[in-house]
Amino acid sequence: MKRRRTIRIGVIADTHGLYDPAIERWFAGVAQILHAGDIGRRDVIQRLRKIAPVVAASGNIDDYEKSGLPRRVIIRRGKIKIAICHVLYEKGQLTKDAEKWLDREQPTVCVFGHSH
């Protein structure tokens, strides 16, 4: 029987340009950080990258064309397929666009923000 390896992943969203130094304590030892958008300022990502590699999607306050970040990201960790985006719901409803994307991608896990 193959032994499973546990990987810790830090998940964050909606930082809006703010970086709480406590993140360094919370994310100590993570293998990767997923940021689900509304980053706000590039230095937030730069500081997170000092902790672990970062995969990020742009949010509605992050002009995604200027940020260079995609609106949606799919990554794989072994057999786990992770979908990362910012806006999945609007007014308590899954958006039609998001529903199509999720139906097409069939992720195991979906990480999103914009829920505040």
Question: What annotation goes with each model-predicted range?
Answer:
Residues 1-54, 62-71, 75-79:
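N-terminal active-site segment of His-dependent metallophosphoesterases
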Residues 14, 38, 59, 86, ...:
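Active-site glycine-centered loops adjacent to acidic/histidine catalytic or metal-binding residues
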Residues 24-26, 69, 88, 96-99:
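Surface-exposed beta-strand edges and their flanking turn/coil or helix-capping segments
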Residues 34, 87-88:
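Short, surface-exposed loop/turn motifs that are enriched in glycine and acidic residues
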